[in-house]
Amino acid sequence: MWPPVDVRSLTAESLGRASLILAVDLLLFVTSILNITVIAFTPDLSDVIGCYLISLSVADLLTAIFVIPLSIYSTLEGNWRIGGDNSIICKSAAYLQIALFCSTVYTFAWICIDRYSAMMKPSRYSEQSLTRCKCWIVFSWLTSMLLCCPIIVARMQVVFYPDAQLCVLDWSATSAYSVTLLLLVFVPTLVTVFNTGWKIWSAMRNPAALDDSQRMLVETDPNFVLTGFLFVTFFLSWLPLITLKVCELIWGPFDMDLSMLTFFFVWLAVSGPCCKFLIYMFTNHQFRRSFLSYISCSMCCSSRSRYEYHDIGNNSFL
């Protein structure tokens, strides 16, 4: 099941691809840990929007721990192919990555609803509690896991996609399930995102029509800018891959080899969440201040420990 890597069969291309996937994995792992730690241990960030951001980072962290390492190993050992088509490992990997992606999409929808409520209905927004937010997050995760259960329990075709080094659903053989997943996950989310986003954008473009409370909220709450950048980076990271697949669907398969281009576009989309840490640092002063204070505190504690150890060593002869 886990064949040893044959070092003699490694090529420059396989090493380059494995290095790129490893870099994405490390970046995603480190930034997710930092995001979760700073938000969870900063009281000013532990609000409703902070819970949604932690949910997004947890999905990224699980991807970095359970999904991407399989792609690294498969790149180095080309004959393994994540256990092969329809293997339990391949099905589990496909299930996990689709479930995590669905939970991310649902969380984006809840973020849009939260920002819409804060902007358009500030009097009712105060009724939003952390308990209700956590219930919506749990509901989103359970729904995502249950919707993707047929991948494991049913005889659905899962194939290894060598251009991306990932296991994916054979959409041609699972068209009914694919349409159901599209209607239950992506269509409601897209409608919610575009509807609420357009209303928020229209209101912010006409600040004279806003109430004083709404205008003050827009000017003082950095979460509007933060969530806006999150949506833009998510869209831009997936745009090249979507454009390539749409072109292949419309004009048919091209004569040129697009495997390397597909590989880069897939892992560009996977690496998109790595930008969350930079977005939080540049748009939220509380996140930036907390992170810098943790860094300075850890450096001070480390230097103090070294000083005490050095002092004990110098006085050990007394």
Swiss-Prot record:
Topology within the bilayer: Multi-pass membrane protein
Subcellular location as annotated: Cell membrane
GO cellular component: plasma membrane
CDD domains xrefs: 7tm_classA_rhodopsin-like (cd00637)
GO molecular function: G protein-coupled receptor activity
Family to which the UniProt record says this protein belongs: Belongs to the G-protein coupled receptor 1 family.
Summary of the function given for this chain in its UniProt record: Probable high affinity receptor for melatonin. Modulates potassium channel slo-1 activity to inhibit neurotransmitter release at synaptic junctions and promote a sleep-like state, called lethargus, during larval development. May function presynaptically to regulate synaptic transmission. Required in rectal epithelial cells to promote pathogen clearance, acting upstream of multiple G proteins including egl-30.
Name of the featured protein: Melatonin receptor pdcr-1
Organism: Caenorhabditis elegans
